[in-house]
């Protein structure tokens, strides 16, 4: 499955647009609290544990979006966009959303 932020794929022709697809991942309160507790891991102003958790959430959102596209019979998702939003009381959760347009490529 090709995922790209561009609206076309170099060297390939889009045969059909299949629709908008999404994937979401939410990092809950306990995870954020644990990550903040590990602030001692910060080296050079960066927290390896926090970045790893964000990476996992991003990968989950992208994988869910790709699976939604696969169910539509897509070969690729173009115009991929990632959004991050803080949710919950006390901003205790982080939601990562991936969205894009599922497409069928010409053979």
Swiss-Prot record:
InterPro entries in the cross-refs: UPF0145_dom_sf, UPF0145_YbjQ-like
Pfam families linked: YbjQ_1 (PF01906)
Domain of life per record: Bacteria
Gene3D superfamilies on file: Hypothetical protein apc22750. Chain B
Homology family: Belongs to the UPF0145 family.
Record's protein name: UPF0145 protein TTHA1256
Organism expressing this protein natively: Thermus thermophilus (strain ATCC 27634 / DSM 579 / HB8)
């Amino acid at each position: 499955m090709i995922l790209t932020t561009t609206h076309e794929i170099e060297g390939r022709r889009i045969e059909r647009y299949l629709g908008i697809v999404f994937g979401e991942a939410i990092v809950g309160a306990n995870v954020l609290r644990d990550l903040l507790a590990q602030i001692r891991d910060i080296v050079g102003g960066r927290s390896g544990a926090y970045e790893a958790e964000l990476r996992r959430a991003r990968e989950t959102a992208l994988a869910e979006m790709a699976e939604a596209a696969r169910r539509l019979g897509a070969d690729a998702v173009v115009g991929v966009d990632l959004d991050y939003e803080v949710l919950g009381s006390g901003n205790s959760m982080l939601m990562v959303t991936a969205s894009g347009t599922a497409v069928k490529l010409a053979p």
